[in-house]
């Protein structure tokens, strides 16, 4: 059964973004449009949405019909969006780094071990597919990718089993890969599926998700107005670490000054952010109970204090 997409930490995102009438916002990961729609409904503002997945265009057109000129969609990944945005600046930017249920639950996309389909996993349908990677990579490279991007302690065992299997048959479906992983480390009922981390790791690798996030953050200052807010929802520790470090490196530590101090404070233009969330916010127990895919989400937000 295909699960309809439920946006994660929607209320927390809106509170952190704080949309205002007349202002412009950038939804960098449109997906099923949950964030874009919520922002548009919150006040009489404008939203530009980005996504590299051509399968979401129909949903974007539906939202455009409802909100007219207040909504615009650009087919691109967020790392390559700067040229297409043509130096436009925004009052707020939001990134939801998770894979939408719409992508996970369609078997032909090859993202999920729960639905048998071709082993693809490409967001845009272009570039190296998961099938090509799994069937061509050396055992060490497979192990390194599964360990680095999936934090999988059994990565070497899984990689060895993959290489052994493909000597007899090509690994061309999600079910085949999932069974190989499960047989490598065992499957205990009631626990998180053993294939979870391996599928996550391969998806991150073939889509260069961490590289794109880092590239976007390096350039985001150029499209965020003064006092504009940057809100990021991540779903695993590698993403969260990148966002946390970026916020830390580009923000001043709070300084308590005496009201009698006479010297002027030194302004460092490289410290252009003020962190809004001192610690990453997590979804409520109630939300996780309603949507298990929210369990690993973390939200961080910061505000631009200089342009």
Curated annotation (Swiss-Prot):
Database matches in InterPro entries: RsmH, SAM-dep_MeTrfase_MraW_recog, SAM-dependent_MTases_sf
Positions that bind S-adenosyl-L-methionine: 33-35, 51, 82, 96, 103
EC number in record: 2.1.1.199
One cellular-component annotation, GO: cytoplasm
Name of the gene: rsmH
Record carries keyword Cytoplasm: yes
Function, in words: Specifically methylates the N4 position of cytidine in position 1402 (C1402) of 16S rRNA.
Molecular-function annotations in GO: rRNA (cytosine-N4-)-methyltransferase activity
Subcellular locations according to the entry: Cytoplasm
Family the entry assigns: Belongs to the methyltransferase superfamily. RsmH family.
HAMAP family named in the record: 16SrRNA_methyltr_H
PANTHER family associated with the record: 12S RRNA N4-METHYLCYTIDINE METHYLTRANSFERASE, S-ADENOSYL-METHYLTRANSFERASE MRAW
A GO biological-process term: rRNA base methylation
Upper lineage: Bacteria, Pseudomonadati, Pseudomonadota, Alphaproteobacteria, Rickettsiales
Enzyme class, first EC level, given as a word: transferase
Annotated keywords: Cytoplasm, Methyltransferase, rRNA processing, S-adenosyl-L-methionine, Transferase
NCBIfam families tied to this protein: 16S rRNA (cytosine(1402)-N(4))-methyltransferase RsmH
Taxonomy, superkingdom: Bacteria
Residue stretches in coiled coil: none
Name of the protein this chain belongs to: Ribosomal RNA small subunit methyltransferase H
Catalytic activity: cytidine(1402) in 16S rRNA + S-adenosyl-L-methionine = N(4)-methylcytidine(1402) in 16S rRNA + S-adenosyl-L-homocysteine + H(+)
């Amino acid at each position: 059964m295909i699960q309809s997409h439920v946006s994660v930490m929607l209320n927390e995102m809106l509170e952190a973004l704080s949309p205002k009438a007349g202002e412009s916002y950038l939804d960098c990961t449109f997906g099923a449009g949950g964030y874009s729609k919520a922002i548009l409904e919150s006040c009489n503002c404008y939203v530009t949405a980005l996504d590299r997945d051509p399968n979401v265009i129909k949903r974007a057109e539906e939202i455009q019909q409802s909100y007219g000129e207040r909504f615009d969609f650009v087919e691109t990944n967020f790392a390559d969006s700067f040229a297409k945005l043509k130096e436009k600046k925004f009052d707020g930017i939001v990134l939801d780094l998770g894979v939408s249920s719409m992508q996970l639950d369609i078997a032909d996309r090859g993202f999920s071990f729960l639905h048998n389909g071709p082993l693809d996993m490409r967001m845009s349908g272009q570039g190296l597919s998961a099938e090509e990677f799994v069937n061509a990579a050396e055992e060490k490279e497979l192990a390194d990718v599964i360990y680095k991007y999936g934090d999988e302690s059994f990565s070497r065992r899984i990689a060895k089993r993959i290489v052994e299997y493909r000597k007899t048959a090509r690994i061309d479906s999600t079910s085949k890969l999932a069974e190989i992983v499960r047989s490598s480390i065992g499957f205990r009922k009631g626990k998180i599926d053993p294939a979870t981390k391996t599928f996550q790791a391969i998806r991150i690798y073939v889509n260069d998700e961490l590289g794109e996030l880092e590239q976007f953050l390096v350039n985001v200052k150029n499209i965020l107005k003064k006092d504009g807010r940057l809100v990021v929802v991540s779903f695993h520790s590698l993403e969260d670490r990148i966002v946390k470090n970026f916020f830390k490196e580009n923000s001043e530590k709070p300084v308590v000054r005496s009201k009698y101090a006479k010297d002027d404070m030194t302004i460092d233009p490289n410290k252009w952010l003020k962190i809004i969330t001192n610690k990453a916010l997590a979804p409520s127990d109630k939300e996780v109970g309603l949507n298990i895919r929210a369990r690993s989400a973390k939200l961080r937000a910061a505000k631009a204090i200089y342009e």
